[in-house]
Amino acid sequence: MSNTHITDWSSKDGEFRRQVSSFRERISPEHKYFQPEKDRYHLYVSYACPWAHRTLIVRKLKGLENVIPVHVVGWLMGPNGWNFDKENDSTGDPLYNSPYLRNLYFRADPNYNMRFTVPVLWDSKYNTIVNNESAEIIRMFNDAFNEVIEDEEKRVVDLYPSSLRTKIDELNDYFYDTVNNGVYKTGFATTAEAYEKNVRVVFQGLDRLEQVLKESKGPFLLGDHLTETDVRLYTTIVRFDPVYVQHFKCNIGTIRHNYPHINQWLKRLYWKHPAFHETTDFKHIKCHYTQSHTQINPLGITPLGPIPNVEYF
C-alpha cells in the first residue's frame, strides 16, 4: 500500500478492491533476459506484509538465502508508503540508498502511477522490477533457481508437485478470496454493510479450512506433502489472532479457541519448521498494522496480546 488513507483503498460502496500487480516477468533458464543467477536478483519485503512473507518462507525452504539477498522496509508506513527508515527496523536499501520503496518503482518505470507494494523481485543487472506478484514469485523460487541451489536436500523441495496441482490451484483460488484477501476486505471496509458481508465470508473460509485439515491424512493441508497452499495460508493465519481479530474486526471467533485443527497446524508450522518461525516477526506485524492504519486505530496503541502470539506446540 502506498499511503495511510484507508478510504483511498476502498470504492464508493465501501468495498476494498486489491490492485492487480503490474510487473509480471518470470525468471527461467530459457528467458531472453531474466535467467537465474546468484546475487543478481534482490528481494524487497516487509516482515509485516503477509504477501511478502510468503516469499521469505519459500526462499528459506528452497535454500536461496545465499542466492537472493533480502532487503527489509521499516514497519511504519507513512504518507509516502514503505520506507527504508532504520529507526523502524529497516535494513536500508544497499543497492541505491533509496529513502522509499517508491523510488525503486520509479527507477523501473518513471511513469508508474499505482500503489507501491511488496514484495518486489528486483534485477540488479537491468535495474528493473522483474515481478511484484507474490504468487508468481514463490513459483519462481520453487523451480527457477534449482541449478544454482547448493543444498541438494532443499533443491529437490517441490511445493507445487504435478500430482497435486489441480487441488492446490482449487484451494488457492478459494482461500485467496475468502481468507487471504477476505481479512483485508473486512478490515478496510468503510461501511457496515461491506464489513458485515465480508467478515461472514472470512469465517466461512475458516470453517472450510478447518474441515480440510480435519480430513487431511497428514500434518499439512494435502497430507504428508508441504505445498505452497500451506505457505499461502500460514501467513494469514499466523496474523489472525494477534492482529486481524482486533484490528480488522474479524472477531466472530479466534483460531486458538474456535478452530482446533487450524490451530494445531499453525503451531506445528511455527514451532517445528524454521522457515516459518524464523521469518515471522511479530514486532513488525503488530506495530505496522496498529500504527500505520491511522484511520482504523487513530491513537496508534498496539495491543500486548494475545500471549503467546502462537500457542506452544
UniProtKB/Swiss-Prot annotation:
Subcellular location: Cytoplasm; Nucleus; Golgi apparatus
Keyword list, A-Z: Cell wall biogenesis/degradation, Cytoplasm, Golgi apparatus, Nucleus, Oxidoreductase, Transferase
Biological process terms in GO annotation: cell wall organization; cellular oxidant detoxification
EC number(s) given by UniProt: 2.5.1.18, 1.8.5.1
GO cellular component: cytoplasm; cytosol; Golgi apparatus; nucleus
Molecular function GO terms recorded: glutathione dehydrogenase (ascorbate) activity; glutathione transferase activity
Domain of life: Eukaryota
Catalytic activity: RX + glutathione = an S-substituted glutathione + a halide anion + H(+); L-dehydroascorbate + 2 glutathione = glutathione disulfide + L-ascorbate
Chain ranges of the GST C-terminal domain: 161-289
Entries under InterPro entries matching the protein: Glutathione-S-Trfase_C-like, Glutathione-S-Trfase_C_sf, Glutathione_S-Trfase, Glutathione_S-Trfase_N, GST_Omega-like_C, GST_Omega/GSH, Thioredoxin-like_sf
UniProt keyword Transmembrane, yes or no: no
Record bears the keyword Transferase: yes
Active site (catalytic residues): 49
Family label: Belongs to the GST superfamily. Omega family.
Role, per record: Active as '1-Cys' thiol transferase against beta-hydroxyethyl disulfide (HED), as dehydroascorbate reductase and as dimethylarsinic acid reductase, while not active against the standard GST substrate 1-chloro-2,4-dinitrobenzene (CDNB). May be involved in cell wall organization and biogenesis.
Protein name (database record): Glutathione S-transferase omega-like 2
Organism encoding this protein: Schizosaccharomyces pombe (strain 972 / ATCC 24843) (Fission yeast)
